[in-house]
């Protein structure tokens, strides 16, 4: 009995020692990852200021913060309502902080932190952990510096989804179901959060996330056993429940007739401006006359200032978008379009110089995974499945996604780079998981042990070579990548001087209301954490994606204007601002066709040091 108790005591102590070692290693991982993120964050903060990349994020921020309508509003149109409402709630509590930008910054660095911590769990020695952190930090710096400095919500959503896939795939399969679910709570939350931030981006990369899920499930010893089905069924169910609940709340929040009407207009606007070409008036005069639009009104589509004309509603927008799409189909048959898209895909994959380093990074990862799988096959037979179907499966899915966006005719960097990032992160997870799967194999004979030792040595060499190649690729790109960010940052600093003068002018004339020509302002962007002013802005755009929304109507009401056209033609405190390089003839012609006798009169100029940037026009007599 005494011997039994001693044995039990020793086993308990061994378990406690193992737990303490595990906790110590986790602490080391978190400290190293935290220092990595701190260094990257400090570098960016010292060298640059964080910017909103596009006007989309600026307007979304304005709506959420309250600077658009006067009160923080969760209906920011682009994001799903739950996360948008949450951010607006924080703004209601503290208005002076840039919560919107802070949220995205935390998302970015939080994803990097989670990936670094999980990666370091694959090694035990501190110097190996530091090496992994340094390599990942270099890759982040070299390939994602632009996305860190210039914040864009589409990229954030993709990074959240990719991180979730990474965490799911690198979860130890030897865990019990409860432990497995517990370890993947963060993965589930990240996917749901990505869906709320930018549902279209999450849906675009969701096939690659599904590939990860299928590959992970396939690693189970008994794939269709009850426990395996239950393990992954709960994960799938939780994801679907979160997505459905998020979408349900969003639909209820946008369920009013005004929002439904605007959403119809918004969808048609997206189709027209993002994927089609606005039909010219002279060649399509019969069509425009059939829907009641003259030439001066068609010009409003071209210069994006259609908000001035109340007759351009969701029905008119839908007809123009449908007509533009139909004309595009006539110009290029579907079969021909498919061939051109396929040709473009192979061009991007092999010949596009602008994406060559991203493609090199992806190819390196594919080759490394394949070689490691072949080597480890000597120890664990099913590891060859990486070569037989996992890598081809991932490549086929990524090819379909690329073909889709190419066929749609719109491949901005925020989408293409997000696809690259997602693919690379998944391949990195496969690289790490191969080492764990090899260690999982029980050694049953001396011969197998020798094979295992020899193969492990070969695999370590492959890992080292892969790391060296990745570091070399990153170092090769780092100088040019940094220079690119420097140039873009300096360009924005110079261009934004005009925008700052415009904002200062409007702020100095709070008793007046200004409507801005849309394309006079698209070149400008705002800093995330500098010059934060969340008070009501006394200017609005003549068009844009939020135009004619309930938020836009609230904005006009807050400014004391019933409609743009009525305001600029009848209210003496309402003005139009246009860049000095842009003509104002379109407004003169529009007013004439509408029966107004007034003409735009330049009454002020905005600029500094003798340089005129914007002209201020008065129409009302």
Predicted regions and their residues:
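Signature aromatic-anchored transmembrane alpha helix within multi-pass, membrane-resident enzymes
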Residues: 130, 184, 230-241, 425, ...
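Membrane-proximal stem/loop segments at transmembrane-domain junctions that anchor or position
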Residues: 254-343, 534-551
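Short hydrophobic/aromatic helix or loop-helix immediately within or flanking a transmembrane segment
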Residues: 73-107
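Membrane-interface alpha helices of multi-pass inner-membrane proteins
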Residues: 182-199, 210, 235-245
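Start-transfer (signal-anchor) and selected internal transmembrane alpha helices
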Residues: 1-43, 217, 227-239
């Amino acid at each position: 009995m005494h011997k039994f108790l001693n044995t039990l005591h020793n086993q308990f102590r061994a378990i406690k020692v193992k737990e303490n070692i595990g906790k110590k290693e986790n602490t080391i991982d978190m400290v190293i990852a935290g220092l990595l993120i701190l260094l990257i964050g400090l570098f960016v903060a010292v060298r640059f200021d964080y910017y909103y990349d596009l006007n989309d994020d600026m307007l979304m921020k304005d709506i959420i913060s309250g600077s658009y309508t006067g009160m923080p509003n969760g209906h920011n149109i682009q994001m799903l309502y739950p996360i948008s409402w949450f951010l607006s709630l924080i703004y209601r509590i503290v208005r002076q902080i840039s919560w919107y930008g802070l949220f995205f910054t935390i998302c970015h660095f939080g994803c990097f932190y989670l990936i670094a911590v999980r990666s370091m769990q694959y090694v035990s020695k501190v110097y190996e952990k530091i090496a992994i952190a340094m390599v990942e930090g270099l890759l982040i710096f070299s390939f994602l510096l632009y996305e860190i400095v210039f914040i864009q919500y589409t990229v954030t959503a993709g990074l959240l989804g990719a991180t979730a896939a990474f965490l799911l795939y690198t979860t130890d399969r030897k865990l019990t179901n409860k432990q497995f679910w517990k370890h993947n709570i963060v993965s589930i939350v990240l996917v749901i959060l990505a869906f709320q931030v930018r549902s279209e981006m999450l849906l675009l990369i969701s096939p690659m996330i599904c590939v990860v899920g299928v590959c992970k499930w396939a690693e189970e010893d008994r794939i269709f056993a009850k426990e395996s089905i239950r393990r992954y069924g709960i994960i799938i169910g939780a994801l679907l429940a979160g997505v459905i609940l998020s979408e349900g709340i969003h639909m209820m929040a946008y369920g009013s007739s005004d929002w439904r009407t605007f959403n119809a207009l918004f969808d048609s606007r997206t189709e027209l401006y993002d994927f089609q070409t606005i039909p010219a008036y002279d060649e399509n005069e019969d069509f425009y006359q059939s829907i009641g639009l003259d030439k001066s009104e068609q010009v409003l589509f071209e210069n994006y200032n259609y908000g001035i004309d109340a007759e351009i509603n969701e029905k008119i927008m839908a007809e123009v978008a449908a007509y533009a799409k139909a004309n595009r189909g006539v110009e290029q048959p579907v079969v021909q379009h498919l061939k051109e898209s396929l040709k473009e895909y192979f061009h991007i994959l092999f010949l596009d110089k602008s994406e060559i380093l991203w493609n090199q990074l992806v190819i390196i990862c594919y080759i490394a995974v394949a070689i490691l799988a072949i080597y480890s096959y000597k120890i664990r037979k099913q590891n060859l499945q990486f070569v037989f179907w996992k890598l081809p499966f991932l490549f086929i899915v990524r090819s379909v996604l690329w073909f889709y966006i190419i066929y749609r005719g719109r491949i901005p960097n925020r989408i293409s780079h997000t696809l690259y990032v997602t693919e690379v992160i998944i391949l990195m997870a496969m690289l790490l998981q191969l080492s764990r799967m090899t260690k999982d194999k029980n050694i049953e004979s001396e011969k197998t042990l020798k094979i295992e030792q020899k193969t492990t040595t070969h695999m370590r060499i492959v890992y080292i070579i892969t790391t060296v190649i990745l570091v070399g690729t990153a170092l090769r790109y780092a100088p040019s990548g940094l220079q690119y960010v420097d140039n873009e940052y300096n360009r924005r600093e110079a261009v934004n001087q005009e925008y700052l003068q415009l904002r200062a002018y409007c702020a100095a004339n709070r008793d007046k209301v200004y409507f801005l020509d849309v394309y006079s302002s698209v070149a400008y962007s705002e800093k995330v954490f500098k010059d934060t002013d969340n008070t009501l802005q006394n200017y609005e755009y003549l068009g844009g994606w939020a135009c004619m929304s309930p938020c836009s109507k609230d904005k006009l009401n807050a400014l004391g204007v019933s409609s743009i056209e009525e305001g600029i033609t009848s209210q003496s405190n309402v003005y139009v601002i246009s860049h000095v390089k842009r003509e104002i003839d379109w407004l003169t012609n529009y007013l004439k066709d509408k029966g107004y006798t007034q003409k735009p009169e330049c009454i002020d100029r905005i600029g500094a040091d003798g340089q005129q940037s914007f002209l201020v026009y008065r129409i009302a007599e």
